[in-house]
Design a protein with these regions (language model features):
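N-terminal lobe/hinge region of extracytoplasmic solute-binding protein
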Residues: 40-100, 237
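Gly/Pro-rich hinge or "lid" segments in bacterial periplasmic/extracellular proteins
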Residues: 73-77, 167-194, 198-277, 402, ...
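Extracellular/periplasmic solute-recognition and catalytic clefts
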Residues: 245-256, 265, 277-340, 365
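Long beta-strand-rich cores associated with HINT superfamily self-processing modules
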Residues: 559-587
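Alpha-helical secondary-structure segments
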Residues: 38, 125-133, 192-202, 240-241, ...
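Extracytoplasmic/peripheral linker and loop segments enriched in polar/acidic and small residues
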Residues: 30, 351, 363-366, 447-458, ...
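Structural transition elements
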Residues: 242, 340, 370-407, 425-430
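Aromatic- and charge-enriched surface segment that lines or borders ligand/interaction sites
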Residues: 91-156, 196, 291, 343-345
Length: 587
């Protein structure tokens, strides 16, 4: 995964460092088995069904129980996390081994044998289970935020998804019947151990797409439930090293060994700890940090290290600042909101608000310049298609409220009042308050409302009905690319392709510009990644001209573990350590 292409190599090579000790992964000798890994944090995942996962926390959890065809290996060297590696696939397809056709539109993937579901009795994972997983991406109840990747890539996926959208989203039987009676031309099980994919056009990043957690195999039992429903969440099935033995929504998870998992069938994961306990409901990063330092907990679930603690921890081997080139957070405008006479649907209003933001204040909130840099583009540095630009400069990154006021007056919309939901964990409240102060200096009032992390992503900003009803006007989500390396589409397409806007879409503001959509298509069909990069740059420029979002920070991830944690290897796409490789001592 994440093949480094021309023009990107220099960017990625700069992302190998970390501040703090943090690299003692192999310093404590041979791994020991046993013990309970204790993880504490704030909010539940927005989706537990692997088909629907869309956040870094959900990605990290899914890795423990839902395997994909390919994946990446956790490492504290950023470069080592980039390559695509086999997971349930037996080998990497190539033109040399005959698994990629001469036209580069046919991929044959052969499955690793011996992988089983945690069913009673155990049952082999087959190619048909992967076909089911791909079909579920477009289910009408809880569709995948990443379905657009495959609609634009796989033959027949668009037609399949259109038909699936007409099925009753509350009827598990009807959805199951649709899947049985229809098929995606581009995803076929040749036999129990062989998958054949047919692409609309050659796609140099197709293997990257097959590492994404929502492409995991789905057991036949999942057809009994409405996807990601409460009932489904209580009946997850595993083919990874752990299984979810107990789940209390919004409160806790208990993961225990999956007895059907075998190390010799899994090249990416290990299994050392006996149990993994995840305790939720703790919004204060200070409280979480205190528990880890006192040895009451081992890892934070969804909280970075508190800003106030960073100076004293810089030389602590348990602390690290890990590179996660991302847009975290960014300010998104609900372009569909009817509030203020539909003001946010007007480009001139959004352009005016670009000048409001004091990025220097936000950098202080998250931990200073070693943790975050100001961001002015849709695509952050270290990602394919990045080109430095600053269309809306302000003195010392501190904002220009006078210009913001002037442009709002000129646009005919002074005195806006904007509904602003914010996440309650980590420093998100402080970020929201800082942005509210910036807007107030421009004469814009904000109505702040606390919104738990799970609800924030799962419903508030990802539900089109909420957007069209004006239940929110601005929000500050974050975006970590789904993969690194040859990853141009992992930012522009999910966040700004207006053609895939709908339930669970990550194009939260409903932005839709035919010019940008056309540039996305051009990039996806470009013969080489280097050519695609030019189209992504053009799309970035157009999106910023439209002021669809306000990029705020390119932020690294601060992370800390307890004294008893060893083999702490980082996964940038999950913004956390790989739970399956950790082991514990009694220290």
């Amino acid at each position: 995964m994440f093949k480094v292409t021309a023009g990107l190599t220099g960017l990625v090579l700069g992302l190998t460092g970390c501040t703090g000790g943090g690299d003692d992964a192999s310093a404590a000798g041979e791994p020991r088995d046993g013990g309970t890994l204790r993880i504490v944090g704030s909010s539940d995942v927005e989706h537990l069904d692997p088909t629907s996962v869309a956040s870094v926390g959900a990605y990290g959890l899914a890795r423990t129980f839902a395997r994909t065809l390919f994946g990446t290996r956790a490492s504290n060297d950023f470069q080592e996390t980039i390559s695509v590696r086999p997971d349930m696939a037996a080998r990497i397809p190539s033109r040399e081994n005959g698994d990629i056709g001469k036209d580069r539109r046919t991929y044959t993937v052969r499955l690793r044998k011996g992988v089983q579901w945690s069913t009673s009795p155990p049952r082999p994972v087959t190619a048909h289970d992967f076909v089911r997983g791909f079909e579920r991406l477009c289910n009408p109840a809880s569709p995948s935020a990443g379905k657009g990747y495959f609609i634009s890539t796989l033959k027949g996926m668009e037609e399949f998804c259109k038909g699936f959208g007409d099925v009753d989203a509350k009827d598990a039987g009807a959805m199951s019947a649709y899947q049985r009676e229809h098929e995606v031309e581009g995803v076929r099980a040749k036999d129990d151990h062989t998958l054949v994919f047919k692409l609309r056009e050659p796609a140099s990043d197709f293997l990257n797409l097959l590492t994404l957690p929502y492409t995991a195999a789905a057991p036949e039992e999942y057809d009994r439930y409405v996807p990601d429903s409460a009932e489904h969440r209580q009946n997850t099935i595993s083919n990874g090293p752990y299984r979810i033995s107990n789940y209390e929504p919004g409160m806790s998870y208990l993961l225990t060994h999956n007895p059907t998992w075998r190390q010799d069938t899994d090249p990416l994961r290990e299994r050392h700890v006996e149990k993994i306990e995840i305790t939720l409901g703790q919004d204060s990063p200070e409280t979480v940090q205190q528990q880890i330092e006192q040895g009451v907990a081992d890892l934070a679930w969804d909280q970075p290290v508190p800003t106030s603690a960073i100076p004293r921890l810089r030389d602590d081997d348990r602390f690290a600042i890990r590179e996660t080139p991302s847009s975290s957070p960014y300010l998104v405008f609900n372009t569909l909101s009817p509030s203020n006479g539909g003001a946010l649907g007007k480009r001139e209003v959004r352009q005016a608000l670009q000048y409001a933001v004091d990025r220097s204040a936000l950098i202080k909130i998250v931990g200073g310049p070693s943790v975050a840099k100001p961001l002015h583009t849709v695509i952050p540095p270290g990602n394919s298609g990045y080109a430095p630009s600053n269309r809306y400069p302000t003195p010392n990154e501190s904002g220009n409220p006078a210009k913001c006021r002037e442009l709002l007056e000129k646009a005919g919309h002074p005195g806006l009042t904007l509904k602003f939901p914010y996440r309650t964990n980590s420093v998100h409240k402080l970020i929201a308050q800082s942005l509210a102060e910036n807007l107030d200096a421009c004469g814009v009032k904000t109505e702040l409302s606390a919104d738990s992390g799970g609800a924030f992503y799962a419903g508030t900003i990802s539900t089109p009905a909420n957007a069209r009803a004006g239940e929110w006007d601005i929000a500050a989500p974050g975006w970590t690319p789904d993969w690194y390396g040859n990853n141009g589409r992992s930012i522009i397409q999910p966040l700004f392709d207006g053609r895939t806007y709908g339930q669970n879409s990550t194009n939260y503001g409903g932005y839709d510009n035919p010019e940008v959509n056309a540039l996305i298509d051009a990039a996806l069909t470009a013969p080489e990644p280097s050519h695609a990069g030019g189209y992504w740059q053009q799309a970035d420029k157009k999106i910023m001209e439209d002021a669809a979002i306000v990029p705020l920070l390119n932020r690294s991830h601060t992370i800390f573990h307890s004294t008893r944690v060893h083999s702490a290897f980082f996964l940038p796409t999950t913004a956390g350590y790989d739970y399956t490789r950790l082991w514990l001592t009694d220290d």
